[in-house]
Amino acid sequence: MLLGRMGMTTEAPIFVRIFKEESELEVWKARADGHFYHFKTYPICNWSGELGPKVVQGDKQAPEGFYTVSKGMMNPNSGFHLAFNLGYPNIYDRAHRRTGDFLMVHGKCRSAGCYAMTDALIEEIYGLAREAFAGGQESFQVHAFPFRMSA
C-alpha cells in the first residue's frame, strides 16, 4: 500500500491544501515524527468563480482562506456523492462581513461555489479523512489559496 511505503498509517492525521488556479487539492499525512508530509495531489474537477475570496452569499465564488473541518462536517449522505463542509465563513470571513454557507469539497464534478471532485477521488479523500478521525484526529485544516505562492 502507498501509505506504508511512504511511512504513513491509514489513521494518521491529515492536512489539506487547495490551489484554485492549478485546480489541485493536496492531502498531507502525519508520520510518526509528528510532521506532515505530502501524500498525494488530486485534480479538482470543477470550481466556480474567479481567483479571489468569496464575499457574499450567491456570488458562486469558491472560498479562499484557512478552514477547520470537524467530524460533524463530514456528509456521507450528500446529494453530491460524499462531501465535507469547509466551515465557511471562518472568523476572518465573518469579521469582514462575508456571507455564505454550505461551501464544500464534494463529488459529482459540479460547482456553484464549492470545490468539486470526481466521485472516485472524493471517495479516496473522504476515506482518508474518515480514517484520520477514527484514529483520533479531532479536526483537520484546509488551506485554500488562489494559486501556489513562490518567490
Feature map (PLM): residue ranges:
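Short, basic and Ser/Thr-rich N-terminal targeting/leader segments
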Residues: 12, 19-23, 63, 80
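Short Gly/aromatic-enriched secondary-structure transition segments
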Residues: 31-47
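N-terminal post-signal-peptidase region of extra-cytosolic proteins
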Residues: 1-15, 27-29, 46-57, 64-71, ...
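Primarily extracytoplasmic ectodomains and periplasmic/lumenal surface modules that are beta-strand-rich
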Residues: 14, 22-26, 32-36
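Exported/periplasmic cell-wall-interacting domains
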Residues: 58-151
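A short catalytic or substrate-binding loop motif that flags glycine-/basic-rich loops and adjacent residues
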Residues: 8, 17-21, 76
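Acidic helix-start/capping segments at beta-turn-to-alpha-helix junctions
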Residues: 19-21, 43-49, 142-148
